């Protein structure tokens, strides 16, 4: 662990790592998009979306590209961390001048998703009664999140996106755009995402949510007034540790850590630990300083709800409604959303730019390969964006 990493963990974790009203705005822009009626019932009476933009918009808006983040991402595609922005840009090697999504050519819009905790309305936001929503924040689905993104597009005056791009949970949303709003994009990129959440994926999500709920400090979601160190950081960190095991591959963990000891102290007793355990601890602890526990629960519940075929005649029928030129990318070592998940999509969308095949990227990094393998991912995205549509 580096000195910089150690400094980032000094002090007790906050009750919630969410961006809160009054925090530095950083590069966020905000749009109020009104209320949203939810697929599972209920209504959020007022939704505000935090988003960032990159590049210049053409007068006719024809160069607008929507980029959708993964479960624990945010609107900060590129740029440094700083006050109000706990992490650096998560796709700085893909989005920017001269890069695959070239901001000298494209106007990129990146929103924080509904239910998130970096500026868009979610559990850490204030409800109409002036208190945090907490666990009162209603159950939401991928379709609800896309409805809010579509409302943002309306507010920005963007009728048709040049492309909608998403990876992981963002890829679920991008596919829902293609199925549910087929006339609103010309190109579509689905990276490391399925058309439907499997039983295996739902099971993984459920144990993460339970880890948070079993933390006594969770207090049924009513923890926002807790002092630093007294919030549900243990449960949230444990959920993050569970998730990391599916974000990375066995080969990478074995190559990086093998059976090495942390700090040279033998783990064959009560004092020492394996280095891989320390790695998980570090990332769990770090995560609690930038995320909210109830937001995490609501978002993984939304992932589990994902099924583009629900009430549409099944998955294959739903995929057949996609009209955009479509790129589907998978990672060969992905054990969260393995390549067969992407093959189902590629074979049934009519506009596949690869003849119904998946672009399979070889990577030791598992699911996170779509965030790390910039050269291969960038090459595929650039090809899609150069496709006439």
Swiss-Prot record:
Pathway in which this enzyme or protein is active: Amino-acid biosynthesis; L-methionine biosynthesis via de novo pathway; O-acetyl-L-homoserine from L-homoserine: step 1/1
One of the record's GO cellular component terms: cytoplasm
Main location: cytoplasm
Reaction catalysed by this enzyme: L-homoserine + acetyl-CoA = O-acetyl-L-homoserine + CoA
Alphabetical UniProt keywords: Acyltransferase, Amino-acid biosynthesis, Cytoplasm, Methionine biosynthesis, Transferase
Location of this chain's protein in the cell: Cytoplasm
GO biological process: homoserine metabolic process; methionine biosynthetic process
Positions contributing to substrate binding: 240, 368
SUPFAM superfamilies for the chain: alpha/beta-Hydrolases (SSF53474)
E.C. designation(s): 2.3.1.31
Gene Ontology molecular function: homoserine O-acetyltransferase activity
Domain AB hydrolase-1: 63-371
Assembly and oligomerization: Homodimer.
Family named by the database record: Belongs to the AB hydrolase superfamily. MetX family.
Protein name: Homoserine O-acetyltransferase
Annotated source species: Clavibacter michiganensis subsp. michiganensis (strain NCPPB 382)
């Amino acid at each position: 662990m580096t000195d910089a990493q150690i400094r980032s963990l000094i002090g007790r974790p906050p009750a919630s790592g969410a961006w809160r009203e009054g925090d530095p705005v950083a590069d966020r822009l905000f749009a109020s998009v009104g209320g949203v009626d939810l697929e599972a019932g209920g209504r959020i009476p007022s939704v505000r979306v935090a988003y960032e933009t990159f590049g210049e918009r053409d007068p006719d808006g024809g160069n607008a590209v929507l980029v959708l983040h993964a479960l624990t991402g945010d609107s900060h595609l590129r740029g440094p961390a700083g006050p109000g922005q706990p992490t650096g840009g998560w796709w700085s090697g893909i989005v920017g001048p001269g890069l695959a999504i070239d901001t000298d050519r494209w106007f990129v819009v990146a929103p924080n998703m509904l239910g998130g905790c970096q500026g868009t309305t979610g559990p850490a936001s204030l409800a109409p009664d002036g208190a945090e929503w907490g666990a009162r924040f209603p159950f939401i689905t991928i379709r609800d999140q896309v409805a809010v993104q579509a409302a943002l597009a309306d507010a920005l005056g963007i009728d048709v996106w040049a492309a909608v791009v998403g990876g992981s949970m963002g890829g679920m949303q991008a596919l829902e755009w293609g199925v549910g709003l087929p006339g609103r994009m010309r190109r579509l990129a689905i990276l490391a995402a399925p058309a439907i959440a499997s039983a295996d994926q739902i099971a993984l999500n459920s144990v993460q949510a339970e880890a948070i709920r079993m933390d006594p400090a969770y207090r049924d979601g009513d923890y926002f007034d807790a002092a630093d160190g007294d919030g549900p950081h243990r449960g949230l960190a444990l959920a993050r540790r569970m998730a990391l095991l599916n974000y990375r591959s066995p080969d990478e963990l074995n190559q990086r850590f093998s059976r090495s000891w942390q700090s040279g102290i033998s783990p064959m007793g009560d004092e020492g630990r394996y280095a891989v355990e320390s790695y998980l601890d570090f990332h769990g602890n770090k995560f609690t300083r930038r995320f909210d526990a109830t937001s995490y629960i609501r978002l993984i519940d939304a992932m589990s709800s994902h099924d583009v075929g629900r009430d549409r005649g099944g998955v294959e029928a739903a995929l057949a409604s996609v009209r955009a030129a479509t790129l589907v990318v998978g990672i060969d070592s992905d054990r969260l959303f393995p390549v067969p998940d992407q093959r189902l999509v590629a074979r049934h969308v009519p506009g596949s730019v690869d003849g119904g095949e998946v672009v399979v990227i070889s990577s030791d990094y598992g699911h996170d390969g779509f965030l790390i393998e910039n050269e291969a991912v960038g090459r595929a995205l650039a090809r899609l964006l150069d496709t006439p549509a």
